[in-house]
From Swiss-Prot:
Source organism phylogeny: Viruses, Riboviria, Orthornavirae, Kitrinoviricota, Alsuviricetes
Name recorded for this polypeptide: RNA-directed RNA polymerase 2a
Subunit details: Interacts with replication protein 1a.
GO annotation (BP), single: DNA-templated transcription
Organism: Tobacco streak virus (strain WC)
Transmembrane region(s): none
Homology family: Belongs to the ssRNA positive-strand viruses RNA-directed RNA polymerase family.
Superkingdom: Viruses
Compositional bias segments (type: Basic residues): 791-800
GO molecular function: nucleotide binding; RNA binding; RNA-directed RNA polymerase activity
Domain RdRp catalytic: 459-574
Length: 800
């Protein structure tokens, strides 16, 4: 690039001189330009051919070539007077640079230039050369002739990023080179097999929390029925009245008027939205659960309009390059530890390690591989909509129909080759982050590993809610990610290929017959979605706030979610930049420790230490107890997922504190919730055993169409016998022998996981159902796990 610029300057200067001389006019600064370029050429030529060229010979060559009448001849060697030797070159006599040895050869047209060159270096008279030293030479600088020039070069301040070290210690472990699990692919894709330095946190971090819940007070009977409906009705008064089973039918059969940007529609595509309706289980409680959405052209078009089209244009005019440089500089200054960043080497060998991990975990078909990343069309995406909707946190379900989210994704062959690079980038980002920054992802970077002291001493919490985060991203966010990936050591050819393909991409939903294109916005669902959104979020926060301020104790970022904990309230004068500069519709909703739909609480462990506990948001959790999109085949997985999150509610203090936080989040202190805490206390009994979970969650009579007849005929009498038991006079069911036996058997089985009468007391890996299935008996009649029997599907419920 420097050579191109130099050639352009020479070209324009020559053109200017030619135009002037053609009219017989010499430019005013002609002599100055010649002096500068002549001196530059002499120095460059001498430095390039230092073995046989000196400044004297180069000057003779240049001056001789410039004279058309010059005839090359042997120049007599002149004796050098040491008095005139310059300070920096003992082999050149600057006082004898005239070329004209004969009187008939005139150099009158260059006398001024020669006079200038002859005095380019000067030692004052009366001073011997040997007495000159470094210090004495400086004393005579004022008497040395200055170089006349009209070019004034102003000293521009160069912003240097100082190095720092926050004291965070990360284990660097050397990993030897490993063999590829698919050598034919890794060789073709130019993935190198060599050793590398692993930057993961190893034995210094735990993969599971230490905290265990205390037993619920004896005043609460865990055998009482779980009924969260009063709490949901209290928080969302209109959710119970909404029956959305026929909402999609209205969308498909009624007239519709949509304003969308340019897209392609295949009108011959038709999807039956009634297919599979009779396979969905009917819940017992109406608490705002949403029905399954069938991918159709209209449903997909509604989702695309909201998630991808009609991009908001909120940015004002700004200098793109200046803002880009400031964003990257502030990110590296405020977010990254420069000492650890300087230790990062270019990626070499790490991509093969993560490539092998991807093959082991995902087991993609190797036939999907289409070639190296630079030869694959990364700008072609596939599209689909999510058939399961998120619970609604506002009481507007009766007036607004929720729109499903969209997923934009590459084929497996592309993901297979791009995921290893982004996994390397994520590990490197976690390595260089300062200690006050938390990115909850992976086994060794979870919320409970946060420093509880920072959370406990934080008095102010800044939660930032970005609306339309993915589709609002533009060129600025695109270029910021590009620069940050290069700073993390990702190969430049890969980064360039990836981001060039994201300047404009073509998306196609073949099942629904829709095609459209987008420019810089986030492709929700590709291999870089989470990491890219995290980088963008941290960049915005570092630009709007001074994250290096000691007032800020911690910063948590995960995708588009973020939380800042501080001692004093953060300044708000720059928060409008989120809209006017970064094009994000931004809300700052609550002064609460809340991130990723979880409340953060500081709890005390058994050994006296403290730990951060992430508690699910009850406003969403209670709505999941009345699902309308469950099928029999996923019922056991749904039960297992509830076991993994409801174990925290075995502690009465956690239930109380969570209820207070959720109450304030919903009503801002204007209303008290009477049933929320009791509903949270009763949640663990819901998953005490699978039998109780099925009985309290599923309406078997209404779900008869999707349950096998022989299983249903066994279930109904079994439930009827348990429901029609002897009750006391107050209407409270009396415990029977079957209840006690069933509870005892469930407790004995769960005691193996260190719990009694509860689903989980700590986070553990998913159960080994093969070992569990051998520890219980099987019932040939019902196939349902009761106090005596277990299912025939490796411990799962078999209703079909």
């Amino acid at each position: 690039m420097d050579l191109v610029i130099k050639n352009l300057i020479v070209y324009h200067l020559r053109r200017r001189i030619d135009i002037g001389t053609s009219f017989g006019i010499e430019p005013a600064d002609y002599i100055d330009w010649v002096k500068v370029f002549l001196l530059k050429f002499i120095i460059e030529h001498t430095a390039r051919f230092a073995d046989f060229a000196t400044i004297h010979t180069t000057m003779l060559l240049v001056l001789g070539e410039d004279d058309p009448n010059y005839v090359e001849k042997d120049t007599p060697i002149m004796e050098i007077d040491p008095f005139y030797l310059p300070y920096d070159d003992l082999d050149v006599d600057y006082t004898s640079l005239r070329v004209c040895g004969d009187e008939d050869q005139s150099c009158s047209d260059r006398d001024e230039l020669s006079d200038f060159i002859s005095n380019i270096s000067h030692i004052p008279e009366g001073t011997s050369w040997g007495s000159e030293s470094d210090t004495s030479f400086v004393e005579h600088l004022e008497t040395i002739q200055d170089i006349p020039t009209k070019c004034e070069i102003a000293d521009k301040p160069v912003e240097e990023i100082p190095f720092d070290d926050d004291g965070k210690v990360v284990n660097d472990v050397w990993v030897d080179a490993e063999l590829s699990n698919a050598p034919e692919i890794s060789c073709d894709a130019d993935i190198r097999a060599c050793g590398f330095v692993s930057l993961r946190l190893l034995e210094s971090s735990r993969g599971y929390p230490k905290w265990t819940p205390e037993r619920v007070s004896s005043g609460l009977n865990p055998d009482l029925p779980v009924n969260s409906k009063p709490a949901v009705d209290e928080i969302f008064p209109h959710h119970h009245s909404v029956d959305d089973r026929f909402f999609q039918e209205w969308v498909e059969t009624h007239d519709i008027d949509l304003e969308v940007t340019s897209c392609d529609l295949d009108m011959s595509t038709f999807n039956d939205w009634t297919k599979g309706v009779d396979t969905r289980l009917v819940p017992n409680m109406s608490v705002g659960g949403l029905s399954h959405r069938v991918p159709t052209q209209r449903e997909a078009l509604l989702a695309i309009k909201k998630r991808n089209m009609n991009v908001p244009e909120l940015q004002s005019n700004f200098d793109h390059d200046d803002v880009l440089n400031r964003c990257v500089t502030r990110f590296i200054t405020h977010v990254v530890d420069k000492t650890r960043l300087s230790k990062l080497n270019p990626i070499s060998g790490e991509e093969l390690h993560y490539f092998n991990q991807y093959l082991e975990n995902k087991n993609p078909p190797l036939s999907e591989y289409k070639g190296p990343v630079p030869l694959v069309a990364l700008d072609k995406y596939m599209h689909m909509i999510k058939t399961t909707l998120k619970p609604v946190e506002e009481d507007n379900l009766h007036i607004e129909r929720p729109i499903p989210a969209t997923i934009t994704y590459h084929k497996k062959g592309v993901v297979m080759m791009t995921s290893p690079y982004f996994l390397c980038a994520m590990v490197r980002l976690l390595y260089v982050l300062k200690s006050k920054f938390v990115v909850p992802t992976g086994k060794y970077h979870q919320i409970f590993q946060m420093n509880p002291e920072l959370l406990k001493h934080s008095k102010e919490f800044k939660e930032i809610d970005f609306s339309k985060f993915d589709k609002s991203q533009g060129r600025l966010h695109h270029d910021v990610q590009f620069r940050l990936f290069l700073a993390l050591g990702i190969p430049e050819h890969f980064v360039t290929t990836w981001f060039n393909s994201h300047e404009k991409s073509y998306i196609r939903d073949r099942d629904c017959g829709i095609g459209f294109s987008v420019d810089y916005q986030r492709r929700t669902g590709d291999a870089c979605t989470y990491l890219g959104n995290t980088l963008v979020t941290l960049s915005v926060l570092s630009y709007v706030y001074d994250l290096s301020n000691p007032n800020i104790l911690f910063v948590a970022a995960s995708g588009d979610d973020s939380l800042i904990g501080s001692i004093e309230p953060l300044p708000r004068e720059k928060e409008d930049l989120c809209v006017s500069l970064f094009n994000f519709e931004t809300k700052f909703p609550h002064n609460q420790p809340f991130i990723c739909s979880k409340f953060l609480l500081v709890v005390e462990c058994d050994d006296g230490s403290e730990e951060v506990l992430a508690v699910p948001n009850p406003l969403k959790l209670l709505q999941k107890l009345g699902p309308k999109n469950l099928q029999v085949t996923v019922l056991d997985d749904y039960y297992q997922s509830l076991c993994d999150i409801l174990w925290v509610f075995n502690d009465a203090d956690v239930c109380r504190r969570t209820a207070e936080l959720a109450e304030y989040r919903r009503f801002k202190g204007t209303k008290k919730c009477l049933f929320l805490e009791s509903a949270l206390l009763s949640l663990p009994s819901l998953v005490a055993n699978r039998m109780k979970f099925v009985r309290r969650t599923i309406n078997l009579e209404s779900s008869r169409a999707c349950i096998r007849n022989d299983v249903y005929s066994d279930l109904v009498p079994h439930f009827d016998s348990r429901v029609s038991r002897c009750d006391d006079s107050d209407g409270v069911r009396t415990s029977t022998f079957d209840d006690r036996k069933s509870s005892k058997h469930a407790s004995d089985k769960l005691r193996k996981t260190e719990c009694y009468g509860e689903a989980r007391c700590r986070i553990k890996p998913r159960r080994n159902r093969k070992s569990e299935s051998g520890a219980v008996q099987y019932s040939q009649s019902s196939g349902i796990e009761t106090g005596k029997a277990n299912s025939s599907r490796k411990g799962r419920i078999k209703l079909h």
